[in-house]
Amino acid sequence: AHNLDNTAGQIGSSNGNVGLNLSGDLNNNTDVSVKDAAGKTIKSTIAAANGQIDINTRNVSNQGGVIYAQNTHLEAQDVNNQSGEISAANNVSISASSVDNRLGTVFAQDELTVTVQNGLNNQSGTVAAKGKVTVQAGSVDNQTGSLYSQKNALDLKSQGVINNTDGYLAADTDLLIAAKALDNNRTNQNTQQAIV
């Protein structure tokens, strides 16, 4: 297909995989005007509770939506996850030109890998995993955001600036940071061992 609009919709598989290969855009936004009988906002959801989600498309718009599976893999030019959730019971991998995760959550129970050619905007967002977290980006804006590994290492690399003003960078084991410049004003960093 070219485009897929799943606004306030549900795409799922109880025991299998979900694969979406689009030449256009994936819209998984939550339309705040869509409410259930109790008045709760219906979240657009793409889920494979016991399987894997593979999404390969031009743009992913998951504003306020949920993408969840045992393993979640996204490959796109632009990923917009503002106030959305991208997660997995095991691993999450995202490969994109840009990722906007403002007020959003990207979380893996095991390992998380985010590769962004241009900018990762994680203002007031969370990019985290229980296992190892690997982030490679052209630049990282983590103002008031959180980038961390609960039980393993955080490997954060940027070809440009990492802005961590009022942000949180943490790892249970190693915290590895490589960048052209690091703005670390008013921050919290926790680790067993830090290498900057």
Segments from the language model and where they lie:
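A composition-driven surface/loop motif
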Residues: A1-V196
